[in-house]
């Protein structure tokens, strides 16, 4: 295991929160409504059993963190009138969770996380942010490096009061998790068009996500209703995808097999994100600025996802001082 991905000791946690962490580094979208959020803490690495915590101001939170130096710190995506009871729900952020260690398709073979799968998770996040902005017209979007992946947090007013069902539909669109429509009619005759022939809307979204999956297949993955032979054929010929020669790729796979591959990829796309996080209106998420003690990485807001490198920006000082 690489040094920065080793668990933090209690002494290292104490050093981080007393010497490096600063409550003023909290993102504004959390600091501005601190008193409306529920906080939760994991003190021993067994999960956030210390729940229903509320902090009226940054000073009280800072005092708690420095005294307790928790294994993990979380805050709710929901805003409450009475957060100490988790009652009086008002609204919730729209969340997308991409965890590098849980990606069903990734080109590395590590047991947890490594620079390769973290970068592939970042690629997914960039595509998602582009879709949220370009297709859905959303703008109040924050990307958070969680320590083992990324959280995309959306605070546009029009999505904050949505229920779980609508959030699930947004997830399916953004993830490319629906099989794209192939059959169309002009009122007189019907015809078929593949997703790569329609460079707009959901078909464009799906094509981008399918490209990501196909370019990162190792060749040993199980894709529903697709043979291992077809998966290997896709891997051998993915240079066609790189060159945007989708029609030739479809011919190599086989016109009758290709729709099954598309359907299988749509199911994989759904598993590239944790759907439970998106639909849970009362979820607690790792607190930006806090330490992910399992991997000794800092959970932090990412100002520029295009150039962000967690191995340069999210490593606490104590990691460099390990023997």
From Swiss-Prot:
One of its GO terms (biological process) is DNA replication, synthesis of primer. Keywords: DNA replication, DNA-directed RNA polymerase, Magnesium, Manganese, Metal-binding, Nucleotidyltransferase, Primosome, Transcription, Transferase. One of its GO terms (cellular component) is DNA-directed RNA polymerase complex. It comes from the Archaea. One of its GO terms (molecular function) is DNA-directed RNA polymerase activity. Its EC number is 2.7.7.-. InterPro entries: DNA_primase_S (IPR002755), DNA_primase_ssu_euk/arc (IPR014052), DNA_primase_ssu_PriS (IPR023639). The active site is at residues 97, 99, 274. Its cofactor is Mg(2+); Mn(2+). Heterodimer of a small subunit (PriS) and a large subunit (PriL). Catalytic subunit of DNA primase, an RNA polymerase that catalyzes the synthesis of short RNA molecules used as primers for DNA polymerase during DNA replication. The small subunit contains the primase catalytic core and has DNA synthesis activity on its own. Binding to the large subunit stabilizes and modulates the activity, increasing the rate of DNA synthesis while decreasing the length of the DNA fragments, and conferring RNA synthesis capability. The DNA polymerase activity may enable DNA primase to also catalyze primer extension after primer synthesis. May also play a role in DNA repair. Belongs to the eukaryotic-type primase small subunit family. This is DNA primase small subunit PriS. The gene is priS.
């Amino acid at each position: 295991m690489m040094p920065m991905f080793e668990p933090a000791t209690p002494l290292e946690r104490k050093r981080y929160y007393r010497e490096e962490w600063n409550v003023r580094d909290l993102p504004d979208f959390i600091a501005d409504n601190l008193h409306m959020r529920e906080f939760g803490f994991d003190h021993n690495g067994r999960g956030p059993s210390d729940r229903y915590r509320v902090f009226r101001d940054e000073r009280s939170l800072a005092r708690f963190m420095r005294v307790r130096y928790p294994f993990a710190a979380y805050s709710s995506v929901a805003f409450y009138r009475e957060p100490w009871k988790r009652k009086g729900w008002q609204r919730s952020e729209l969340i997308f969770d991409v965890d590098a260690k849980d990606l069903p398709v990734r080109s590395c073979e590590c047991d947890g996380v490594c620079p390769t799968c973290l970068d592939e998770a970042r690629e997914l996040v960039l595509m998602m942010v582009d879709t949220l902005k370009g297709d859905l017209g959303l703008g109040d979007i924050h990307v958070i490096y969680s320590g083992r992946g990324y959280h995309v947090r959306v605070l546009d007013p029009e999505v904050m009061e949505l229920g779980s069902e609508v959030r699930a539909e947004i997830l399916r669109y953004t993830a490319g998790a629906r099989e794209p429509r192939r059959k169309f009619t002009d009122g007189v005759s019907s015809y078929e068009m593949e997703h790569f022939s329609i460079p707009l809307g959901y078909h464009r979204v799906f094509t981008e996500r399918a490209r990501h999956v196909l370019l990162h297949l190792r060749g040993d993955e199980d894709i529903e209703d697709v043979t291992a032979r077809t998966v290997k054929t896709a891997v051998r010929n993915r240079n066609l995808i790189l060159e945007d020669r989708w029609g030739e790729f479809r011919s190599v796979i086989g016109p009758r097999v290709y729709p099954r591959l598309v359907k299988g990829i749509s199911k994989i796309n759904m598993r590239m994100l944790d759907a439970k996080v998106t639909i849970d209106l009362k979820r607690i998420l790792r607190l930006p600025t806090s330490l992910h003690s399992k991997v000794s990485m800092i959970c932090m807001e990412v100002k520029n996802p295009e150039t962000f490198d967690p191995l340069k920006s999210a490593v606490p000082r104590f990691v460099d001082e390990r023997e």
